[in-house]
Amino acid sequence: MVNVMNTLSFASLSFNSNNTPVSEQFDDIYFSTQDGLEESYYVFQDGNQLWQKWQTHDVESFVIAETGFGTGLNFLAVADKFQQFLSEFPNSKLKRLYFISFEKFPLTSEQLATIHKNYPQFATLSQKMTACWQPRQTGCQRYHFEQIYLDVWFGDMLDNLPQLGDLYTNRIDAWFLDGFSPDKNPEMWNETLYRQMFSLTKNGGSFATFTAASTVRKGLQAVGFEVKKRKGFGKKREMLWGEKPQQSETAPVNYPYFYSESQTEANDIAVVGGGVASLFVVLSLLEKGKKVTLYCKDNALAQNASGNLQGAIYPQLSDDDERNIRFYVHCFDYALQRLAQIEPLVNFEHALTGVALYAYNDKTAKKLEKIARQTNDDSLFKLCSAAELSEKIGLKVPNGGAFMPQSGWLSPIQFVQGTFAYLQTKGLRIVLNHEVKDPQFSEGKWHWQHNGKTFSHQILVLANGHTLTQFQQAQGIPLYPVRGQVSQIPTTSALQQLKCVVCYDGYLTPVSKANTHCIGASHVRDNAETHFSLEEHHENVAKLQQNLTACDWTQGIDESQNLAKQGVRAALRDRVPMVGQMPNFSVQKVQYQNLYNQLRRKQAVENAANFANLYMVNGLASRGLTTAPLLGEMLASLICDEPLPISEDIWHVLSPNRTWIRKLLKGSKVE
């Protein structure tokens, strides 16, 4: 298996006599020794005529792509300028800036902070960025600063550019063609880059670069750009800028069977749910200016699987498909950002004091060792001896295992209910005791009946867990319910010493303010019952005592109160969620019945048949606290036709039609 997280290398940095940062990998300066900030304004902002373009921009988001993030100075400068624009033109159509950048050798947060000290005017944004800056694997990582979105694609740009995929085709408004000079970094400045740039750029989109090298000019012209020269910055005689012709042909869709549609003009959105999955869809949609109504069938929010008193938040690391690992790590990092944003606004119990993974048998120990070889990041996952793990846990354990220091726990019910209440102050409308049934699409809206009244919305999002399969449109989605019961026990003098979540073939949380712990959880597949089970209650405690059999602190637990929370999780066999536009299974299985031969013969393939204006996020299983923030952001970005914070290969893994498309791609028949 590929060691996916070990492929990222950090920059070797030094400073020259002018205190300008220098890359030792490329033996080149990061920006002009004369004035790096003025160079950024002149070359990239003026070169792309950003201020003028923003004033006449006719959609809500503007997308800039940059070929080398470096010190982040270009980002800070353009983000600051965009904030000025929003202040000066509050009624402008343009509301959000997306800055997409690539970086093969990232600087550390400490190095960035040191360099940024020279630019105190950017102190606030720099502090926000460096606080959550933690490159740990290749691929996209989204950083979110209110109306400004920064997507940094770590790793080799020529590997990452194709992963922007179909959803970025013809989407980029302006390029900052930066990076080290062509003679220092010839691997970047080549035809592959220029062709990718051309297909990703909007008709009429522009680029600007500090160089005037003839190889660059000819390369850009050869793929279709109109290239022009202007005076260079400082001592440079010339620089290049240019545009993609307005009449350029749009690049073909590479994966039509995973095609999804956006709805930029639709503003009125209904979300069906009430738990953590729907929460983050709602949050991201509101941030993107949409009018959102939440419909919940219960008389209160977070009544199902999101209603536990305590739940762990940590990435699911496994020795399975490396794309799954990348997905869960990206989710975890984004979830930490979201928690940091929400924490000052909502009152909920939480403690990011780590999660201990206990090696309760040889098989588990070997699995943890394999994961450690794959991650190679002690801030994410670190093997521990028995003594080290005992210190982390706060109680003695006979075996070692692993520790995830940035992980922890929170109260899902407090978090979900509290954040929904906060979002109501931001325009969210919540309708309880309302079960959406048999929605039908006509005249550009989804309609359904409830208590003799008709309800209508332009877009319908289903984030309703295991009850998704009750909708006729969800035919073919292989979702199944998993009943889970979490036991609640009073604390003991020993358990009060527990410092972090302990995971084994179950989990135990530290003491809550109510002086209780949660022990979870039973796992009963194809069962949607929510009654209390005394058998499962005893099994939860027994599993703890059996897995940590030599630990006397697991004894003496009082389970006589029979306190527990039952929930039904929505799961999928391949253990990754689904997110995207709702596929029309009955049409697609006919549409693609000969897909294998069509691709083999290089014949044209139709775009996938989906239900118009209908979207879904589901299958989060027991990882909703970790995955829901990024999934919600992805779905909102798709709906709004804005950049997605995920690589195309992972997007395909998450596609709602993936199960039957996989079969059809192999030439198998789908019934």
From Swiss-Prot:
BP terms from Gene Ontology: methylation; tRNA wobble uridine modification
Q: Where is the region tRNA (mnm(5)s(2)U34)-methyltransferase? A: 1-245
The terms under GO molecular function for this entry are:
flavin adenine dinucleotide binding; oxidoreductase activity, acting on the CH-NH group of donors; tRNA (5-methylaminomethyl-2-thiouridylate)(34)-methyltransferase activity
Question: What is the catalytic activity of this protein?
Answer: 5-aminomethyl-2-thiouridine(34) in tRNA + S-adenosyl-L-methionine = 5-methylaminomethyl-2-thiouridine(34) in tRNA + S-adenosyl-L-homocysteine + H(+)
Record's subcellular location: Cytoplasm
InterPro entries in the cross-refs: FAD-dep_OxRdtase (IPR006076), FAD/NAD-bd_sf (IPR036188), MnmC-like_methylTransf (IPR008471), SAM-dependent_MTases_sf (IPR029063), tRNA_MAMT_biosynth_bifunc_MnmC (IPR023032), tRNA_MNMC2 (IPR047785), tRNA_S-uridine_synth_MnmC_C (IPR017610)
Principal place of residence: cytoplasm
PANTHER family hit by this protein: SARCOSINE DEHYDROGENASE-RELATED, TRNA 5-METHYLAMINOMETHYL-2-THIOURIDINE BIOSYNTHESIS BIFUNCTIONAL PROTEIN MNMC
Q: Give the protein's function.
A: Catalyzes the last two steps in the biosynthesis of 5-methylaminomethyl-2-thiouridine (mnm(5)s(2)U) at the wobble position (U34) in tRNA. Catalyzes the FAD-dependent demodification of cmnm(5)s(2)U34 to nm(5)s(2)U34, followed by the transfer of a methyl group from S-adenosyl-L-methionine to nm(5)s(2)U34, to form mnm(5)s(2)U34.
Q: Which NCBIfam families match?
A: MnmC_Cterm, PRK01747.1-2, PRK01747.1-5, tRNA_MNMC2
Listed name of the protein: tRNA 5-methylaminomethyl-2-thiouridine biosynthesis bifunctional protein MnmC
Gene encoding this polypeptide?
A: mnmC
